[in-house]
Amino acid sequence: MIFAAWCACCAISVAAQDCEISLTIAKAAQKEELPSQVQEILGNRLAAAVAGQGSVANSNFTPFFITAKINTLYKETLSGPPVSTALTVQLTLYIGNAVGQKVFSTLTVDAKGVGTNINRAYINAFRAINGNNVKIQEFIREGKEKIISWYNSNYRQILVKAQKSASMHEYDAALYYVTSIPECCVGYEEASKLIDTYYTQYVNYNCQLIMQYARSEWAKSPDAEGASKAFDWLVFIEPGSSCEGEAKALYNEIKQKVTSDWDFENREKYKDEAGLKKQRIEAARAIGVAFGNGQQPVTTNITWLH
């Protein structure tokens, strides 16, 4: 039993090393409000450290975040020339679940910075957030392991949410859920099979709306201007979608009345089957990311950290 648990722990550890986990760079409530430029540099340092461990941290919304709280321990103005500011700060780094309000990993780093102004002093102090630092590597690894463990335990609920969303024709939400499960997690294979299913449903559902818009533009103005507006909609019809035949029929109808150099039938969107599958997955992920960002709170401040 102990050996099995140890093996499972090792498996998660290895998976964490090879697995890309997406984190949202969040703002923590600070004792002293940081200027936007300083906050941006702090976010960039966090993103670089995470990237060094094979993952991604950016502004895209995910349930999981990385952030840093800053406690200024010492501040002094140094006489020049030039006059400068010296700081000693305590940086406390966190990786956690914003939705569940749970911290997965934390690390405190003491840092010093000197600059020609207070902002430069902070920015120089942030150099302590270095992906080559073994303690920071361990902090990120621990956070990733716990995120993987969370997905392994909760992927069923995620797939249920995806299924429920799809049943209500909320295919962008369904794609958000199924594309959120990392490749290294036990639910990924099951989720990946649903990506193509939900993407096809998304395309077919939306192509009916696209056809309505295209027909409306052509009906309102059956001339070159209306043809141009209709074609602007038709180009969004995916090859292989349930509306492809209708789109070609409308295209041919327009071409009979309006002479132009448009080429709808011969668009080379996909070179081969492998390219099609890859492009569909990328498109599905983009749809999911866009939906997730739409669900993002008005503020990304993490106010519950202590």
Report residues per predicted region.
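Amphipathic beta-strand/beta-sheet edge segments enriched in Tyr/Trp
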Residues: 67-118
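N-terminal segment of the mature soluble domain
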Residues: 17-69
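Bacterial Sec-dependent N-terminal signal peptides
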Residues: 1-20
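Short, well-structured alpha-helical interface segments that form or flank functional binding sites
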Residues: 60-65, 88, 157, 173-176
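C-terminal/domain-edge helix-coil "capping" segments
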Residues: 103, 107-213, 219-229, 239, ...
